[in-house]
A protein has these predicted regions:
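NTP/phosphate- and nucleic-acid-binding module
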Residues: 1-478
């Protein structure tokens, strides 16, 4: 903003001044060249989309308030596109009726709108943004996987040409996009808003929200009986550990959420030294959740929630970090009291365990099994997904195979945020005076200054040099 690159017009919405627009145009051209090189065909799809299109896929209801919904003057439900899977299927549904036309890929560089609750970080987390989104269509999963690998390599070339060879790909969660496999392209930087787990032993990389959390527990030699002890003012794991002289890994803590669909409570129990992954929880439940506002009517005793004697009418889940443990400390569901000696199977009956925890720093790598995980901050600059038949099946896209049978094609999708990419280049390529743009995307190649503009000879020489540079195709700021 201070450098004259952009100006805010509303929360999370910016106008671009000429220097930034020149940068983003060059980034867009690099992206176009690499998408064309892998057989992409550029199209343009509307920003405003009918709600009925999103109803076909089921996302009109399943996606939360980040999707901006409104009605036109006739009362027809409409949305502002935050992603274009539905529009892409609608665009090629008739074209893709015969197997001979596969595989193919379409892409666009288009404005999108996502109604972020907390826009932040300049162009990193905005509400209106420009994105390259591409969609590929295939007759087999094997063909999709081959093209997915080609697109992965194309992304590596894009980021290298843009001046960000440091970008790495990490395994990620598919989230609302659906599908079986996805990767995020991350710039590792302390300014990042995402957490990335990297194994120092085998090189495994993943977003901590998606990485499998492996916990190894040694069962105690002797099980203690379940006992209730008074723990005044021990509302947190830290306070509880200090009061009872235990470590967080010896605690069974409760994290409470509410389902966005009906507001019902979800109580997740996990080991006290771990954090819950809201992404994993959402995927398991099949609906969005939010941290709960615990009210007296809920029957929950905040700070003292435990699995023994917990009130009914809510979903209760257990993380795999508790499997095989014993002699745990947990809430007693009474204000100011905890229980010691908890062994879940003995005290709660049959328990099902699932992975709901974030992979922690120093944790065990899910690939090589070594405790060599290091967690770093990162900014996501791109993503790729193998969507399978999630959208084509729901929206009735079919093709006729060589044997005359109708089949459903599978899809991949591939996104890059153009403004976010520019912001990331600026984040790592700057000095005390401002951005140091790589030549390939710099707004101008030469900054020509006439230091004695009041001298006719100097001014004439500067003008002549400016004209000569322009004639030879050099971009000059004068």
């Amino acid at each position: 903003v201070r450098g004259g690159y952009m100006k805010g017009i509303a929360n999370g919405i910016f106008s671009q001044y000429p220097p930034l627009r020149r940068v983003t145009r060059k980034l867009e051209q690099i992206i176009r060249e690499e998408m064309d090189a892998i057989g992409g065909q550029e199209v343009s799809m509307p920003v405003v989309l009918p709600g009925a299109l999103w109803e076909e896929s089921g996302r009109y209801v399943s996606v939360g308030s980040e999707l901006l919904r409104f009605q036109d003057r006739t009362g027809t439900p409409m949305v502002l596109g935050m992603t274009h899977e539905e529009a892409a299927v609608q665009l090629v549904r008739e074209y893709g009726r015969t197997a001979a036309r596969y595989p193919f890929m379409i892409y666009q560089i288009q404005t999108k709108f996502r109604d972020e609750a907390r826009p932040r970080g300049g162009l990193i987390r905005v509400r209106e943004f420009t994105m390259k989104d591409a969609y590929s269509f295939h007759t087999s999963q094997q063909d999709l996987e081959r093209y997915y690998a080609r697109c992965h390599r194309a992304y590596e070339r894009i980021f290298a040409r843009a001046g960000l060879p440091e970008v790495v790909s990490v395994a990620s969660d598919s989230g609302m996009m659906g599908g079986s496999l996805s990767h995020e392209f991350m710039l590792l930087t302390p300014a990042g808003e995402d957490s990335v787990a990297v194994c120092g032993a085998c090189g495994y990389r993943a977003n901590v929200e998606a990485a499998a959390c492996v916990a190894h527990n040694e069962p105690p030699a002797v099980l203690q009986p379940l006992q209730t002890v008074e723990t005044p003012d021990a509302h947190t794991i830290e306070a509880l550990c200090a009061f009872l002289h235990v470590i967080p890994a010896q605690c069974c803590k409760a994290v409470v959420y509410q389902k966005e669909t009906d507001g019902s409570y979800v109580v997740l129990f996990l080991r006290g030294d771990l954090e819950a992954s809201q992404t994993k929880l959402t995927n398991y439940l099949g609906c969005d959740v939010r941290p709960a506002a615990i009210t007296p009517e809920s029957g929950l005793c905040a700070g003292f929630i435990g699995p023994v004697g917990l009130c009914g009418g809510m979903t209760v889940l257990y993380d795999t970090s508790l499997q095989g443990t014993g002699n745990l400390v947990c809430g007693a569901n009474r204000q100011g009291f905890h229980s010691t000696g908890l062994q879940l199977e003995r005290d709660c009956g049959t328990v099902e365990y699932h992975d709901f925890a974030k992979l922690p720093d120093g944790g065990v790598c899910p690939v090589c099994g070594r405790p060599a995980i290091r967690v770093s901050r990162g900014v996501e600059v791109g993503n790729i997904f193998q969507l399978g038949a999630k959208y084509t099946q729901a929206m009735g896209m079919r093709y006729v195979d060589a044997d005359g049978t109708e089949k459903t094609p599978v899809m991949g999708c591939y996104g890059i945020g153009v403004g976010r990419l520019a912001a990331c280049v600026c984040e790592v390529r700057h000095d005390d005076h401002g951005p140091v743009w790589p030549l390939a995307i710099a707004p101008w190649q030469v900054h020509l200054c006439c230091l004695r503009a009041d001298d006719a000879g100097t001014k004439a020489a500067a003008d002549a040099l400016y004209a000569s540079l322009q004639k030879n195709g050099v971009e000059v700021l004068y």
